[in-house]
């Protein structure tokens, strides 16, 4: 019909659309919630002491750079920074040779709080609109040299990619599960604990990372799975 023709003329194929960010990101904090990831990365830099003693007591995080958050699929320049080989006398300025991905979930905070006024754990989720996939790209060779003693800087400020799609907390309700820790580990301090969080603080969803190169796409190859995890295993 004529009406259908006008309707179809207004549609654009999803494969031809370049999606943007789902929200205006004013600020973001990156938390280190996977104890397995923290231990693995710690072994690279501190083989004898991979997991620092504060990890199981306080959520570890750092303030990221909101101005370099890009939508998933966006291109960005490979970062440059100082690196130092173990046998080198001085560091060198080079392009990153160990660019790494990080499978993360972005918690979209829609409601703020008054400066200096803490949010109680029991009301914390009232401030969360939903979640989206997030990739905090990391230059591991630059990070290994620059992170001492205050943590990463140029190795993590060049690009982070956020999915254009947000899944609301209401849609995640069927996937909620109890927040659990190993019996031998310490319980969170009272201000980091609540009955509601213990009852359904975890989200039971499977997460995967797949690699699909340009050549794979050209050949119709679906890609290769690099890693998988379940968000209910997050330590915080």
What are these model-derived regions, one by one?
Residues 234-236:
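Extended C-terminal subregions enriched in glycine
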Residues 1-228:
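Active-site microenvironments in enzyme catalytic cores
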